[in-house]
Amino acid sequence: MKQLFQVEMVNESVNTLNKATKVLMIIHPKYLSDETLYMIDQWILKGGPTLIFLDPYAETEISRQQGVPPINPRSNLKKLLNTWGIDFDDKKAVLDAEYGFRISRNINGRDIQVTNYPWLNIRGDGLNQNESSLSNLSTIVMTTAGSFISNNDEIMLEPIITSSIKSGLGDAQKAGNPKGDPRDLLSDIKAKDQKHIVSGWIKSDLKTSFQNFKK
């Protein structure tokens, strides 16, 4: 990305943006202050282009203490999402019997070929063919991805990437366990013929989460 664009990294306590900002990318946010959330809120309400990446279980997150797993590998932007009418369960990961990768995993001392349901190889109908950003892609790989639901009839959430109908939601921490048996997750995949939105555009007018906020 830095080869094509001028990228400026900002820390989690920032409350103002560079005036030259064209696009705001919010990646795996946690513990953001109200001042920072207010800045994001106002940027979006003024029409600022924004890409938000949330993760129910960041497998590659680096722990602050070497050798100890991260205490909280989940993203959280609930204050804004709740106002917008978008639900993201930060404790649930998408499990997919159709798009799941076939892998070899050592289980009880034996190497076994299994479908790893949280590791998604999304293709075909899972990719919105009318979406220009996907025009040159035939497949997208995601691991322990979350899902988004619009629970507000006034908010349009247009799917970009979806699971297959042979999918469900399961415990993200259990799904992200590199030593676990993926077959134990199968009970969470129930035949509801329902796709889950893994990525989407919000194409509606949004309301502020800070009606009476004072800086």
Predicted regions and their residues:
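Acidic, S/T/G-rich, low-cysteine, solvent-exposed domains in lumenal/extracellular/periplasmic regions
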Residues: 1-215
